[in-house]
UniProtKB/Swiss-Prot annotation:
NADPH binds at T10, G11, S12, I13, G36, N38, N124, E126, G205. 1-deoxy-D-xylulose 5-phosphate binds at K125, S151, E152, S176, H199, S212, N217, K218, E221. HAMAP family: DXP_reductoisom. It comes from Gloeothece citriformis (strain PCC 7424) (Cyanothece sp. (strain PCC 7424)). This is 1-deoxy-D-xylulose 5-phosphate reductoisomerase. Pathway: Isoprenoid biosynthesis; isopentenyl diphosphate biosynthesis via DXP pathway; isopentenyl diphosphate from 1-deoxy-D-xylulose 5-phosphate: step 1/6. GO terms for biological process: isopentenyl diphosphate biosynthetic process, methylerythritol 4-phosphate pathway involved in terpenoid biosynthetic process.
Amino acid sequence: MKKISVLGSTGSIGTQTLDIVAQYPDQFQVVGLAAGNNVELLSAQVHQFRPEIVAICNLDHLEVLKESLSSLDYSPIILGGEQGIVEVAGYGDAQSVVTGIVGCAGLLPTIAAIKAGKDIALANKETLIAGGPVVLPLIEKHGVKLLPADSEHSAIFQCLQGVPEKGLRKILLTASGGSFRDLPVEKLSTVTVQDALKHPNWSMGRKITIDSATLMNKGLEVIEAHYLFGLDYDRIEIVIHPQSIIHSLIELQDTSVLAQLGWPDMRLPLLYALSWPERIYTDWETLDLVKVGSLTFREPDHHKYPCMKLAYAAGRAGGAMPAVLNAANEQAVALFLEERIGFLDIPRLIETVCDRFTTHNQAHPTLDDIISADQWARGEVIRANEVIEKSDRIVSVR
């Protein structure tokens, strides 16, 4: 039986991970749970899975959590705040930690888990995108495994099994095209938050669904693939695949192409990250290619989706620039979800902030450098947007 801790247990990744644990109680045991704000769901999860340690990031909810767990017939460790999340990440005899915390907030807990010798089921791509220069050396130093738990990188990881070290020519990341893949670019200026949250294929959290709509999600995955698989950026390509059946492909030196296929269901890559190198039998719906009928592909439209080029540029710049890109995107998406900016303002703000960053040529940033760049970029998005809002108010008065 494998013992696991789940960071971000009340989010999309966390709840699907716990669905797997509930389905396979003889395979997995939950040692730790950590969440951000959803105290009611976290409490229910603790009652069901009986972890040894639990933490909620929002300290305002800590006493409520303690009260809701007072009826338990055992006494788990109950913590609060960011340090509480870090404690869960490195706690006890968990063999694997699922990192499902959204955004760069997952970086410090992931580092704590690595230093504690835990294998990482990586569902938080931002950790590697922002912290790759720090995280990868720690992975090597502590001898832990970094197993991708998102569909695209899991697909690549699976396709690479048995491929010789120099056998890989390039990676092809598939993208659904997001909520607006069939919408003309001239109509994007009027789309709403609710429009953007209607993903045609996947059930995901709000932030990643917006990233899918801008295709920044795919741009971030390019940077993640660079760190995970060691390829230069000109050997990582994006292709639009509306059906989301092929989760990604690799091209080998002899021009052979290998692909991993399956229904768009996040449980599959999560299960593989938890069970690797084993394959566990499931009773989930099997892929019926006759039912699917056809698989189609398109060239991505860089005019419609400028976030892809921004991501490639940040990745090639290296240093702390990917952290700036990631933080600017997180902050811009948050503003969009709050309906403070329009959909097309997301890439505009990101580009503005990346252009203002002046220390991107630092080849080997420290953790402090990355955290500083992250905080600077978030503040810069707010400042840039305030200038835009002020300008809009002046225009409206005139």
